[in-house]
């Protein structure tokens, strides 16, 4: 996971940086990361043997760090992870205090790529725009495509490109949020990078993580990526308008999610048909008033 692999060291870009004369992105915000030639040297890796099932399957998450990186001991990975997450969590608490002072509801939308969360978000914003002030932070590795889609609804949005990074972190939110015009008592939606692994570990200062799972992904996704669904308060089972065309067991999916997180709330939803949208909007209003 990225708390130990260092993927957060990629080229970060937040919309507006290109106008800063001191920004490396002033002339080319989407320049690919440099690929310098690297000298490969031999590394004597600490001994680590993955667990093995009777069928021969290998499991690299059984060590004390819960993961594996070549050339790094389990104890060192734990030290790196604790250091990274401690810094992030302190920043997240500052973000949370700022949002709470303005009574803003902040939600961290997480999912696999292609789950439909941007389409669901645009439909949500269209339904809220005359009643609730909203703003959006869009996270992707590259492009401002999704932020442009959000702005087309009339909602303020800012794109955060993580470069090689596979998730948003609390510092990115601290940098991006002040650039958005969001009134007190409004809702800030943070659409995280499409990834069901690393975003689970990084607190952004949100009130809730909302996991979006598409019915095209398979019923057992919560069991395959348990950390994300354990961290989420709500699961939106998306694209249910496609159920007549799929061999997807809704009850099995719900059971898998609740096996990982017995307290998780679940809404069946479709931005295309409108099913579940009222329930989703009611949930948002309940959280705003909580």
From Swiss-Prot:
Record's keyword annotation contains Lipid metabolism: no
Protein name according to UniProt: Hydrogenase maturation factor HypB
Binding site for Zn(2+): 166-167, 198
Alphabetized NCBIfam families for the sequence: hypB, PRK10463.1
GO biological process, one term: protein maturation
Known outcome of mutating residue 167 to A: Does not affect nickel content. Mutant lacks hydrogenase activity
Effect of residue 166 to A: Does not affect nickel content. Mutant lacks hydrogenase activity
Record's comment describing the protein's domains: The N-terminal region contains a high-affinity nickel-binding site and the C-terminal G-domain contains a low-affinity metal-binding site, which is not selective for nickel and could possibly accommodate other divalent metals. Both metal sites are critical for the maturation of the hydrogenases.
